[in-house]
């Protein structure tokens, strides 16, 4: 079933009652991202929002050219848009332009020469090993079933470094308890198998002992209080509660992913192995964790070595 498609509400369209040819092509492109490429609904919404904003300025596919695209981005600069926003919009337009040219809607890939602004990537928030251990052991729910569920969620997030959306999508049948492996459906519907340790294994077993008291759902591994598959917002609340108990500020579920990756590298894991475990399509995405790991190594050296 299509997750976005051409029937999504055209929130970016303003003015005309009927969509322009450019807006229609954008919808076709988003449908391509959904049905062919397999991008997530959230990613497609981002593309659609950026491209509708472009279409509202350029108005027609016949006006789609490098000068008009630069003018549109210039307006965004004048409006004070961040470098990250400009880079994202540039990437969206370049992807659309390439698709439109390949499918005969443009004679040339007009956006190919658009230059994306460089953005500095902040190093992610990382917990120390002791902090991480304390954190995952501090599920804050008072109800026994919810406490065991939350403990299993925290343990699994830290053990595997999986994304929240991936955790929410896990079915009971995806867990191999004998081998301590979990099957995960990642970005672009790419499937991978990720190992987990004894702590997560024990937490999962404890949760399964009480799971059926919260739900009749035959598939979902984790469920909310109403018995339905848990969602990302509920997972964030679970992480927030544990963070408050542990005294950790501004910790997100993604911070556990960053922490897991860094601790793997600290422990001697190969960068390519970490890339595979995290489901990164590009090594460049994984390499940010080497900077974090190297920084931690330097801090430890400066603190502990007598000749530092």
Curated annotation (Swiss-Prot):
A GO CC term assigned to this protein in UniProt: cytoplasm
Pfam family, one: Phage_int_SAM_1
Segments passing through the bilayer: none
Cross-referenced Gene3D superfamilies: 1.10.150.130, Intergrase catalytic core (1.10.443.10)
Superkingdom field: Bacteria
Main location: cytoplasm
Cellular compartment(s): Cytoplasm
Disulfide bridge positions per record: none
SUPFAM superfamilies (alphabetical): DNA breaking-rejoining enzymes, lambda integrase-like, N-terminal domain
CDD domains in the record: INT_XerDC_C (cd00798)
GO biological process: cell division; chromosome segregation; DNA transposition
Active site residues according to the UniProt entry: 163, 187, 254, 257, 280, 289 (o-(3'-phospho-dna)-tyrosine intermediate)
Keyword terms: Cell cycle, Cell division, Chromosome partition, Cytoplasm, DNA integration, DNA recombination, DNA-binding
GO MF terms, alphabetically ordered: DNA binding; tyrosine-based site-specific recombinase activity
Core-binding (CB) domain location: 20-101
Coiled-coil segments: none
Job description of the protein: Site-specific tyrosine recombinase, which acts by catalyzing the cutting and rejoining of the recombining DNA molecules. The XerC-XerD complex is essential to convert dimers of the bacterial chromosome into monomers to permit their segregation at cell division. It also contributes to the segregational stability of plasmids.
HAMAP family in the cross-refs: Recomb_XerC_XerD (MF_01808)
Record's subunit section: Forms a cyclic heterotetrameric complex composed of two molecules of XerC and two molecules of XerD.
Family: Belongs to the 'phage' integrase family. XerC subfamily.
Protein name: Tyrosine recombinase XerC
């Amino acid at each position: 079933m299509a997750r976005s498609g051409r029937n999504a509400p055209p929130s970016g369209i303003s003015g005309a009652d009927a969509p322009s040819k450019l807006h229609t092509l954008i919808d076709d492109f988003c449908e391509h991202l959904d049905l062919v490429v397999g991008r997530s609904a959230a990613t497609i919404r981002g593309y659609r929002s950026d491209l509708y904003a472009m279409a509202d300025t350029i108005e027609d596919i016949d006006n789609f050219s490098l000068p008009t695209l630069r003018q549109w981005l210039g307006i965004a600069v004048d409006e004070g848009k961040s470098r990250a926003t400009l880079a994202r919009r540039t990437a969206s337009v370049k992807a659309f332009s390439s698709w439109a040219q390949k499918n005969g809607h443009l004679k040339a890939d007009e956006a190919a020469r658009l230059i994306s602004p460089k953005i500095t990537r902040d190093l992610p928030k990382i917990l120390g090993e002791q902090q991480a251990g304390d954190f995952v052991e501090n599920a804050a729910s008072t109800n026994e079933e919810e406490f065991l569920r939350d403990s299993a969620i925290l343990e699994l997030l830290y053990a595997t470094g999986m994304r929240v959306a991936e955790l929410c999508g896990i079915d009971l049948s995806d867990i191999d308890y004998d081998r301590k492996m979990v099957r995960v459906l990642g970005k672009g519907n790419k499937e991978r198998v990720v190992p987990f340790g004894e702590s997560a294994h024990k937490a999962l077993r404890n949760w399964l002992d009480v799971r059926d008291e919260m739900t009749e759902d035959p598939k979902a591994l984790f469920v909310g209080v109403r018995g339905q598959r848990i969602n990302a917002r509920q997972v964030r609340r679970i992480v927030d509660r544990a963070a408050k108990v542990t005294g950790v500020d501004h910790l997100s579920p993604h911070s556990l992913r960053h922490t897991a990756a860094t601790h793997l590298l600290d422990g001697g894991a190969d960068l390519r192995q970490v890339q595979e475990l995290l489901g990164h399509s590009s090594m460049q995405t994984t390499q940010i964790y080497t900077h974090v790991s190297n920084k931690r190594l330097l801090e430890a050296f400066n603190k502990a070595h007598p000749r530092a």
